[in-house]
A protein has these predicted regions:
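Intrinsic-disorder-linked linear interaction elements in eukaryotic regulatory proteins
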Residues: 1, 33-35
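N-terminal secretory signal peptides that target proteins for export/translocation
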Residues: 1-14
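N-terminal low-hydrophobic presequence detector
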Residues: 3, 21-22, 216, 387
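Positively charged, low-complexity intrinsically disordered regions
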Residues: 5, 28-30, 382-385
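Generic N-terminal simple sequence motifs
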Residues: 7-8, 24, 31, 40
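Hydrophobic alpha-helical elements and their junctions with loops/disorder across both membrane
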Residues: 10, 23-25, 151
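Bacterial N-terminal signal peptides
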Residues: 15-29
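Hydrophobic small-molecule pocket/channel-lining residues, especially in calycin-type beta-barrels
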Residues: 35-387
Length: 387
């Protein structure tokens, strides 16, 4: 729950996140890419890091919030504006992720934000990625952890063309209240200037969980760009095929079968897709956040996996006539290539998505990831869940 200036911090790429999936289902690669253990290198053993997967559980629910936003934190001026609003936080990925939506009113009118929290089990850290309704651009994540009931996450950023460190802090945590503060530092973290301060009090009359997120939407015009993903809402049986070694001439593929659930969030301006599948090498999970930018009339798509615990560089594109295509440029094996991710409607009950790479400027494309979706009817969902 915060607002930030534009940042130049580097994010992991969409390809690097999808590569994690390829690694998960490729046992030979796992052995090759496994990090050198401290004992193998002759280094002294270190205590294992504390599992922080449940550190943000206090944040779940519906909250009333009072916000003070400092207009120029680095000037030392106390001038600020105040806002009042509501924060709703839902659990995702069995607690390894959270989705937060905030609405607030202030002197400059109505303001909304969307925050995705992701836990990295390898580093035992959380990442915090934010979208503002006014900019609709994903901010690079803050990363950090909790210690003694206090959470601190950090990032490098810029404020009015000045390089700063950014810190978000959760403190004074009780079952029905907590304090959140975002601060800036120009001196390497020696001193911090508050920029965004919020006090949150639980609304005991309301609850929030993943089932509250709309799994469908009322029919809307498919010609409207902002409704380009309407066909995708719901639960889908998913068959996935992944090329194990892209751009190498290899024809070795691996298959997985699972389910994808796509839910509308943020009043329809964004949606969240959760995929869980199983193949010969085990269980795979993937989360995709897609959001519409009303300023550019474009859609963005970003991915995360449990092993990475962080969103990457988003693909950017448009949806038209039931087909959405996203592009970005990334470095693969030391070479820059184009990446294309496409998803399209086949019928009311079927759809398909593909990822492809091009190393010749888009003249030719090699598909490396194919997902085929079949809609699960409400009666089938009840039978699958055992209800």
């Amino acid at each position: 729950m915060f607002t930030r200036a534009k940042s130049t911090a580097k994010l992991p790429s969409m390809y690097s996140l999808s590569l994690v999936l390829l690694m998960v289902i490729s046992q030979p690669q796992l052995a090759f890419l496994a990090p050198l253990k401290a004992a193998d290198a002759g280094a002294p053993a270190t205590p294992s890091a504390r599992d922080g997967q449940h550190d943000f559980e206090f944040n779940l629910g519906v909250w009333h919030t009072h916000i003070r936003r400092v207009l120029d934190p680095l000037s030392g001026s106390p001038d600020s504006i105040e806002l009042n609003g509501t924060v709703t936080v839902r659990k995702l990925w069995d607690g390894r992720a959270q989705l937060e939506e905030i609405e607030a009113e202030g002197p400059k009118g109505h303001w909304e934000g969307l925050t995705l929290f992701l836990y990295n089990p390898q580093s035992h850290q959380w990442s915090q990625s934010f979208l503002s309704s006014r900019m609709a651009a994903l901010q690079p994540p803050l990363v950090g952890s909790f210690n003694a009931g206090r959470g601190e996450l950090f990032a490098q950023d810029t404020f009015r063309d000045r390089s700063i460190l950014l810190r978000s802090v959760w403190s004074d945590i009780t079952p029905d209240s907590h304090h959140y503060e975002e601060s800036y530092s120009e001196d390497g973290g020696r001193t911090w200037m508050p920029a965004f301060v919020a006090q949150l009090t639980r609304d005991r009359d309301k609850t929030a969980d993943a089932s509250d997120i709309a799994a469908g939407a009322e029919p809307m015009s498919s010609e409207q760009e902002e409704h380009g993903f309407d066909f995708d809402f719901g639960t889908w049986k998913t068959h996935s095929s992944r090329l194990m070694h892209p751009l190498t001439g290899s024809t070795a593929w691996a298959d997985l079968d699972g389910y994808t659930v796509v839910r509308r969030v943020w009043g329809g301006r964004a949606n969240l897709a959760e995929y869980k599948g199983d193949g010969p090498a085990g269980h795979v999970e993937l989360l995709a956040l897609r959001w519409f930018n009303p300023n550019t009339h474009e859609w963005n798509i970003d991915f995360a996996t449990p092993n990475v615990g962080m969103l990457g560089i988003p693909g950017v594109g448009k949806c038209k006539n039931g087909r959405c295509e996203f592009y970005d440029q990334e470095q693969i094996n030391g070479r820059y290539v184009l990446v294309r991710f496409s998803i399209w409607k086949i019928s009311d009950d079927s759809a398909q998505s593909e990822q492809a790479f091009s190393d010749d400027g888009g003249k030719t494309w090699e598909t490396n990831w194919i997902n085929k979706y079949t809609r699960v009817k409400p009666s089938e969902r009840s039978a699958r869940s055992g209800t």
